[in-house]
């Protein structure tokens, strides 16, 4: 069982961290992690009874009020077609100002894709992203419109927006960016100006490129008695699962399915109830796949409301 744990009182975060470290030293069957991606502390334990024991210890021994939530889903963002964006950053407030203008094209990246069509490719950086997927950054500038010394700053701006995607703030992946034109000023152009221009040009293009939200899909293996196969398969299908196969393993049948992670919350309890505790399962990450349009729309709306509140 995995849950998100947080303190009820905002000033107790450090106390909760200390309590979790103490519990980890006492109990090797539990562990926790602080996820910078979904901004939650995740508590992993053996089941609901184990979770209740841990909660009792935190509340009665460590004297902390805590709450448990459903873990957020680590979505990804990408694009489905080619688009272009441009942005001029200009700021003047006495003395040297800030100026940069960037034109770029973005495309969905795939292995073996040809060079950018209609552009003069001068150099290319292939970046393996920490969160999976790639960013291909191409210098296609001709005529010295932008000094090459500013390209790393444009890349920084692109990367910053890919770490906080335009749709839901999720990581973006598998995109080729080709910078092909722009303008600079002898005095006012600097690294921060081109970083800002690159970020906004990329964001503009991303929104125009039919962006797609991706969700993690997990391979789920369920081991159950033969007479319970129908019920287990039916339950997996209600969770948007796609059953891929079934085979005998000893006295059990192994059912293999691909299921969205968002549908697997509290599956351990559901499976135990469905099979009277006679089944077990494993699950591991498989791939990312597009979410349904309605799901994407709702998540984008929620993100927009959150950003308004933050502002």
Annotate each predicted stretch with a short phrase.
Residues 1-311:
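Accessory interaction regions appended to the cores of large information-processing enzymes
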